[in-house]
Amino acid sequence: MKDNGKKAGITVLVVEPLKEPYVKTISSGLKSLQAEVGGNIEEIFPFDDASAVILNGDGKLKGLMPNRGLYDCEGRLCDVIAGTFLVLGTAGEDFCSLSKEQIAEYMERYKVPERFSYRNGAVRVIPVPAGGNTKTGKHMGKSPAGATTQDRKAGKGYRADGVR
């Protein structure tokens, strides 16, 4: 990442734990990116398009709240991002605004907040319905991994890849 002093505004997607993502215009400078994620930044490139994820590089070590999962092309959980992160566009070594298409794609991808549970050696992903209530089964239906609320209450857990 270059930090050549430019302070041009870029349009990014902000993804906070337990919240739906939102679009925000921020400075592309290092200090601005650090302020958004709450610390030292790390950039990763988990997608096939010209975009990047900026996250707090020390988020897990600092015990920041788990936020969203990163999944492989087959839908298996690969990693969990801790703390607030940004999705932004890339142009060579510089960061830039997301396109309208990218905004729509990543808004949909990260629309449903997630909680995570570690049980029996497996990380489980629990979608959080609108309003953040994970206690009741209302409005939850089936999770992406196939577990219903009734299954979870009965102790029938599912891993992120859908295996019981």
Predicted feature residues:
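Short, surface-exposed beta-strand/turn modules with glycine/proline-rich turns
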Residues: M1-S32
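Short, surface-exposed polybasic-aromatic patches that bind anionic ligands, especially phosphate groups
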Residues: I41
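Catalytic phosphate/metal-binding cores of nucleic-acid and nucleotide-processing enzymes, i.e., regions
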Residues: F45
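Short, structured protein-protein interaction patches enriched in aromatics and acidic/basic residues
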Residues: D49-C73
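Helix-rich interaction surfaces within compact, conserved domain-sized segments
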Residues: L77-G89, S99
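Extended coiled-coil/helical scaffolds and adjacent low-complexity linkers that mediate multimerization
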Residues: C96-N133, G137
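Non-Sec secretion/translocation targeting segments of pathogen effectors
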Residues: K135-R164
